[in-house]
């Protein structure tokens, strides 16, 4: 078959399977692995063997970079302790534990080769963890920890694997000092090269205004970091992650809005293709692995139980480490220690991916039991993706861990956008001149507050059947844009206008329509969230019946405090009428006074990042 047809076939399978999985609500990685397994046994299908260069150089750098630029550097820093405990401590523990088990059960495997297998299967996969965690709807802190762990742990695992390979080739032990030096060199070199690459690329990016050139530079960025780090025996993985984190954090300052939008869209497309190709290729590896074991003439009665035991050891090692570390943190009363529910989810979220399979091929070809090690690695990848990936949503629901709250997000967004609008209006008052037309200033003020008003309107949409002004604007403006586009297309058919003029006019309409679609999609997601019941045991009748949000009567703080000339400490929002009053720690205690005056029992915090409610009538926290 022609290579072009092979590529077309891969893309077609990926598109069809991904669309089908999304339609029925299944995880794309799981379905693609299963489809790959089935395809691998179809006669005359091209056999694609994963090689270390293909995965570690072709796939891994862009996939890590795509994940890193979307990872919050602030969240990464805030969760650095659990990330390091998982990405370094857990990988080392898993390597030792799985290695000892593999040495015991896998036929014909030496101790060094067994530890190599332990290093191969120790790190969870960045793509698998991110895909499943976001689809499940885990709390954001868990997602941040899992993303951070999966971005960094490959570096630790590759150091452990290189150490095991050195022992295999030298047929001698490797000293702890040698292992420590390898790790320090890999980590230090990777971080250093990553920082240098990030600041080098940032200096270039400052001078680029063309979104096409900026996106081209972005595609080169992973390799600008990865290849030099590998040359100095540093961790290319860490270099890519550091570069991605820094450039993603600085993107709003370094890039124009057009460049950021173009980069985001292009990387989402690249990430979609690479991620799904990776999982399809994982499934396609099963037939060559089985053929290799068959050629070794090892009894299947020994191989199958050994692979199952290695899979079990991989899962158990993570559970033991995560629960053990969580217990220590709780005993030490460490700030931010996980609850047992969070601990259970983190312990179970250990899906492996393509790096595990590719790393097997780094072993020397004459390694005893190499085919059996490869099949064991595939068993771990497929087993964790299927077993943990399928049961993780059930576990999250069973433990009643709630994911991101759309209503709380909307409340924070409304507060944030309001503050931003005030900042913009303040700058307008500073920079305006006497010669600026009054109608232009009025238009700018109106536009500055419109986004703020739209944000607060979204909060009240589920509480009323009346169409908010922003929704009315969206409905009518979309009809206008459709008519405008039709007029331009009709003019195009007459041949009276230049093509470049027509394309520019259509682009302007497309950009406005895309912006309106994003605003309306966010509002629709909020509506879906607000109509979902979130009753919990222990809530009183007032808390159960009260709405979760209400449109505030003012955005300027406590009205009574403003009137009396006093200062408030924190603000509270009445969920019956939207009155904004100060808390009991404030001098006026106007929120409590509002309850005494009106009898409205339930209020909620009106502070960014806080979603708790309080019933004055029953003195109960909701």
Place the predicted regions along the sequence by residue:
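Transmembrane helical cores of multi-pass secondary ion antiporters/exchangers
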Residues: 1-415, 419-422, 489, 493-496, ...
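Short, positively charged
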Residues: 42-43, 257-258, 469-470, 547-554
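In a subset of proteins, long, contiguous C-terminal domains/tails are tracked
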Residues: 2-6, 500-533, 576, 594-622
């Amino acid at each position: 078959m022609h290579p072009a047809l092979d590529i077309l076939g891969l893309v077609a399978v990926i598109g069809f399977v991904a669309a089908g999985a999304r339609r029925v609500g299944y995880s794309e990685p799981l379905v693609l692995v299963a489809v790959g397994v089935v395809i691998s046994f179809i006669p005359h299908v091209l056999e694609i063997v994963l090689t270390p260069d293909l995965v570690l150089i072709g796939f891994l750098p862009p996939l890590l970079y795509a994940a890193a630029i979307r990872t919050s550097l602030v969240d990464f820093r805030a969760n650095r302790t659990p990330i390091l405990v998982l990405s370094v401590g857990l990988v080392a523990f898993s390597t030792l534990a799985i290695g000892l088990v593999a040495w015991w059960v896998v036929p014909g495997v030496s101790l060094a080769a067994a530890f190599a297998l332990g290093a191969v299967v120790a790190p969870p996969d960045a793509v698998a963890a991110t895909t499943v965690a976001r689809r499940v709807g885990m709390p954001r802190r868990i997602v941040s920890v899992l993303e951070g762990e999966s971005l960094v742990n490959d570096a630790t695992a590759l150091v452990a694997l290189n150490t095991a390979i050195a022992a295999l080739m030298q047929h001698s032990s490797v000293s702890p000092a040698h292992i420590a030096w390898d790790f320090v060199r890999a980590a230090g070199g990777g971080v250093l090269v990553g920082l240098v690459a990030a600041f080098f690329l940032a200096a270039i990016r400052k001078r680029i205004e063309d979104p096409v050139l900026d996106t081209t530079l972005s595609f080169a960025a992973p390799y600008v970091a990865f290849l030099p780090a590998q040359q100095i025996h540093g961790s290319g993985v860490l270099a890519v992650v550091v570069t991605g984190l820094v450039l993603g954090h600085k993107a709003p300052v370094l890039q124009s809005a057009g460049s950021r939008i173009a980069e985001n869209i292009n990387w989402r497309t690249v990430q979609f293709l690479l991620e799904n190709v990776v999982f399809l290729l994982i499934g396609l590896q099963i037939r060559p692995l089985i053929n290799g074991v068959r050629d070794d003439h090892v009894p299947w009665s020994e191989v199958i139980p050994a692979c199952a035991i290695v899979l079990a050891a991989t899962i158990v090692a993570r559970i033991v480490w995560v629960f053990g570390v969580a217990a220590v943190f709780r005993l030490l009363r460490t700030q931010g220690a996980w609850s047992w529910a969070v601990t259970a989810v983190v312990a179970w979220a250990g899906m492996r991916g393509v790096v595990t399979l590719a790393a097997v091929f780094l072993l020397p070809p004459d390694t005893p039991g190499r085919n059996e090690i490869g099949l064991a690695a595939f068993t771990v990848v497929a087993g964790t993706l299927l077993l943990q990936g399928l049961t993780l949503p059930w576990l999250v629901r069973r433990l009643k861990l709630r994911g991101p709250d759309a209503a709380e997000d909307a409340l924070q967004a409304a507060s944030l956008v309001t503050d931003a609008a005030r900042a913009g209006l303040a700058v307008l008052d500073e920079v305006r001149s006497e010669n600026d037309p009054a109608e232009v200033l009025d238009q700018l003020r109106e536009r500055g507050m419109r986004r703020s008003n739209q944000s607060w309107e979204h909060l009240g949409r589920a509480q009323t059947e009346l169409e908010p002004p922003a929704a009315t604007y969206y409905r009518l403006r979309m009809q206008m844009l459709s008519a405008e586009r039709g007029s331009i297309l009709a003019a195009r058919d007459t041949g009276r206008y230049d093509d470049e003029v027509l394309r520019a006019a259509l682009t302007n309409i497309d950009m406005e329509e895309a912006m309106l679609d994003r605003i309306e999609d966010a509002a629709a997601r909020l509506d879906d969230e607000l109509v979902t019941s979130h009753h919990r045991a222990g809530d009183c009748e007032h808390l159960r019946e009260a709405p979760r949000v209400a449109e505030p009567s003012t955005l300027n703080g406590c009205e009574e405090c403003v009137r009396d000339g006093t200062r408030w400490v924190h603000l509270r929002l009445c969920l019956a009428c939207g009155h904004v009053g100060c808390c009991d720690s404030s001098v006026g205690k106007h929120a409590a006074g509002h309850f005494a005056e009106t009898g409205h029992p339930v209020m909620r915090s009106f502070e960014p990042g806080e979603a708790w409610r309080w019933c004055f009538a029953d003195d109960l926290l909701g």
